[in-house]
Structure formats: C-alpha cells, structure tokens
Regions:
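Small/polar-rich, solvent-exposed N-terminal microdomains that initiate assembly or binding
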Residues: 1-53, 90-94
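Residues in well-ordered beta-strands of folded domains
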Residues: 23-25, 38-39, 66, 106, ...
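Short, cysteine-centered beta-strand-loop-beta hairpins and adjacent loop/turn segments enriched
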Residues: 46-47, 71, 133-134
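Short, solvent-exposed beta-strand/turn "edge" segments of beta-rich domains on protein surfaces
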Residues: 52-57, 116-118
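A short glycine/small-residue-enriched secondary-structure motif
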Residues: 55-61, 100-103
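Oligomerization/assembly interface segments of phage tail-like spikes and tubes
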Residues: 57-71, 121-131
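Mid-chain, well-packed structural core segment of small domains
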Residues: 69-91
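Acidic-leaning, charged glycine-interspersed low-complexity segments
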Residues: 88-133
Length: 134
C-alpha cells in the first residue's frame, strides 16, 4: 500500500520546500513556501484483474499537491513549475518500500487557483501514482 505519509516524505526529498513546510491533510496556519499533500477522490471501477486481487499486480493512488508559496506571482509560479518538472522527469522511483511503476500527471501544467485570503499564490498539481501491489 502506498501511504500519504510516504508520498509526503518523497516530496520533502525533492528539496523544493523545507521538511516542516510539507503537510498532509489540512494546512492549518499555512506558512509561506509550503506544499500540501492530499488524497484525491476518483471515480470509476477499481483495478482488479481476472481472478481477483491475488492476480492484480498494481493499484492507483490519486494525489493532489497544493503549492502555497508567497505573495509574488512569478516566484510562486516558478516553484510550482519546478515541482511539476521534477515529477515529470522522474525515471525510476520507489517510495518507502513500494515500487512506483508510473506517475501519471493529470493536468498539463500546474493549475493556478489564485490566492488565499492573505494574498499568497497557490497552484495545484493532480497526479496518480501507479504502484506495485504486494
């Protein structure tokens, strides 16, 4: 199973935001230059091979990343694109003890969602981790 906590640790390892600025779940008292890691709901049937789960080799974990940066649009956009490009260029990946077969970016670029109540620019990146079941 691919856990949100493990994905959070991987995002920290990319070096775009400091460890204490990468969150899971709710971003309370959001600090600038932060990245939020959220589970994302999806629709459709589950991935189950003929014969059941014993024959199913992979599963999908939908994730949403919120880049909550600062009051500078250019700097916030640059941070969001740095994260996006870093993810897009991954060539091999294990998160925790789970092998990732494929990262499917679900948006063509970071999505500008405007600013929060304090004028901090935010971007969203949706992605699916297709991972090896155990």
């Amino acid at each position: 199973m691919l856990k949100t906590t493990d994905i959070r640790e991987w995002i920290v390892s990319l070096g775009i935001a400091e460890d204490e600025h990468v969150y899971m779940g709710k971003l309370d008292n959001k600090q600038q230059k932060s990245i939020g890691v959220y589970s994302r709901s999806s629709s459709g049937p589950p991935n189950v091979a003929l014969g059941g789960l014993d024959y199913t080799s992979y599963d999908v974990r939908p994730i949403s990343l919120l880049v909550h940066w600062n009051r500078s649009k250019p700097e916030s956009e640059a941070a969001a694109y740095e994260l996006f490009e870093t993810i897009r260029n991954v060539s091999s990946l294990d998160i925790g003890d789970t092998h990732i077969n494929y990262i499917r970016l679900m948006v063509p670029e970071p999505q500008d969602v405007g600013t929060d109540d304090n004028g901090v620019y935010e971007y969203v990146i949706w992605l699916d981790f297709i991972y090896q079941r155990k």
